[in-house]
Curated annotation (Swiss-Prot):
CDD domains with a match to the protein in the record: HAMP (cd06225), HATPase_UhpB-NarQ-NarX-like (cd16917)
Source organism (scientific name): Paracoccus denitrificans
PANTHER family, sorted: NITRATE/NITRITE SENSOR PROTEIN NARX-RELATED (PTHR24421), SIGNAL TRANSDUCTION HISTIDINE-PROTEIN KINASE_PHOSPHATASE UHPB (PTHR24421:SF58)
Class in the EC hierarchy, top level: transferase
Keyword Kinase attached: yes
Protein name per its UniProtKB record: Methanol utilization control sensor protein MoxY
């Protein structure tokens, strides 16, 4: 916009300067031509000094006649150079209608000639003939008083047109840019608005074609991700079942055998102390292996999954955290409307792992002393289950942007996208750290 104003103003000034130079040249040529004719007439018609005629009277009449012409002036001067008469038609001449600055700008160099008036042997005076551009400058000013406003109005119109075009183009570019910004945020269903201008229509068509291609690629990736999650969960369930069915009985048998051995050795009159220590160590290790196996099985697939409600599943998780981290207070709040509903086994498993990962992050990285897990619905969207984890830990630092997500958060994001859910990474508000998972119900794989 500033460039358009500068260019328009420069063009107006250049055109004005050209018009002024040409007008000044025309005034000079017009007045010099009139001066030459007047001077030639004076030289030819002034009576000779020895002809016996009234030279001064005829010179005065000639001066009055020439002074009445346009673009020239004539006056009679005494031998000392002082005027002997006023201008013959001075009372009929109005003051210059052009402003003083314009007259000074347009007035050419003074052109004049002095013709002696003689009556032999005396010099009676001088007849002064000079170019007078006053009338011509007034005419030029009359033209300029129309041309210059029109010129500057045309310049203003050009600036207004440039501003209008710039605003129009900027708005259309901003609409395309806004659509691209939403696409960059992941909303690939947004499309750039169509336009009647061919150039912008082609630009919008190209952006929309790219968005459609990316949307198709994302849908394919989501489908593959959903299949991968389903296959992964099936494999985890199979491994958990194998561990439970094969390793569990063997560990139980091992502990039973150790207990039987301890009972048999208890009746010996003189049993070695090393034997008691060895049997106790075997019993202790067998117990730890059994606990580790139970933990691994629960990590692969929660034991209550499919047999208890989502609220009971989260309650079992919170109880486990209370047992292993007594210094942290973990609280569970469940909305009664959600307590008996089930979004599906895969969704429940995703909610369970989201809650577990978020609570662990609050304990390990945030050093939280109070963690609250809430399960409710959104007021404006009752079809969504909202799982929110809030803690009083340090959380992510404000003003540093979103931190690089870990593997746990990446897994949550992948599951949420595959299940059509919405995951909100941790953020700070009122000195608390919040994170959410919004799961539709019933939930289906995309």
């Amino acid at each position: 916009m500033g460039l358009a104003c500068a260019v328009s103003l420069s063009l107006c000034l250049i055109v004005s300067a050209i018009l002024i130079v040409n007008a000044r040249q025309a005034v000079q040529e017009e007045t010099e031509s009139a001066f030459r004719l007047a001077h030639e007439a004076v030289v030819r018609r002034l009576p000779p000094s020895h002809g016996g005629r009234d030279t001064m009277t005829e010179a005065i009449g000639l001066a009055e006649e020439i002074d009445g012409l346009r673009h020239v002036s004539a006056r009679i001067l005494d031998p000392e150079g002082q005027p002997l008469q006023h201008r013959a038609h001075g009372q009929l001449r109005s003051e210059a209608s052009a402003p003083q600055w314009f007259s000074a700008l347009m007035t050419p160099p003074l052109v004049e000639a002095l013709v002696p008036i003689t009556h032999y042997p005396n010099v009676l005076g001088m007849l002064r003939v000079a170019a007078d551009p006053t009338d011509e400058i007034a005419e030029v000013w009359g033209d300029f008083s129309i041309i210059l406003p029109v010129l500057f109005l045309a310049g203003l119109a050009m600036v207004g047109l440039a501003f209008l075009m710039t605003t129009l183009l900027t708005r259309r570019l901003q609409s395309v840019q806004a659509a691209m910004a939403q696409m960059q945020d992941g909303r690939l269903s947004v499309r750039a608005p169509d336009d009647r201008l061919t150039e912008f229509a082609d630009l919008a068509a190209g952006v929309n074609a790219l968005a459609s291609h990316l949307q198709a690629e994302q849908a394919e990736n989501d489908l593959l991700q959903a299949r991968l999650i389903g296959s992964s969960e099936a494999e985890r369930s199979r491994i958990a079942l194998d561990l439970h069915d094969e390793m569990g009985p063997q560990l139980f048998a091992l502990r039973a055998a150790v207990s039987h051995a301890q009972a048999m050795t208890a009746d010996l009159p003189e049993r070695p102390a090393a034997l008691d220590e060895t049997l106790d160590a075997i019993a202790g290790h067998a117990l730890e292996v059994q606990r580790s196996a139970r933990t691994a099985i629960n990590d692969l697939r929660p034991m209550l999954l499919g047999e208890a409600s989502l609220a009971e599943l989260l309650a079992e998780l919170v109880t486990g955290f209370r047992d292993v981290a007594s210094e942290t207070r973990v609280v569970l709040d469940v909305d009664p409307e959600v307590e008996g509903s089930s979004p599906g086994e895969l969704a429940e498993l995703s909610i369970y792992r989201f809650a577990r990962e978020s609570v662990l992050n609050a304990m390990r990285h945030g050093r939280a002393t109070v963690v609250r897990v809430s399960l409710d619905t959104m007021p404006d969207e009752p079809g969504q289950i909202v799982v929110r984890v809030t803690d009083n830990g340090k959380g992510p630092q404000s003003g540093t942007g979103r931190p690089t997500p870990g593997f746990g958060q990446i897994g949550i994001e992948d599951r949420a996208r595959a299940l059509g859910a919405t995951y909100l990474p941790p953020w700070r508000d009122n000195r608390l750290t919040h994170t959410e998972l919004r799961m539709p119900r019933p939930c289906k794989l995309r």
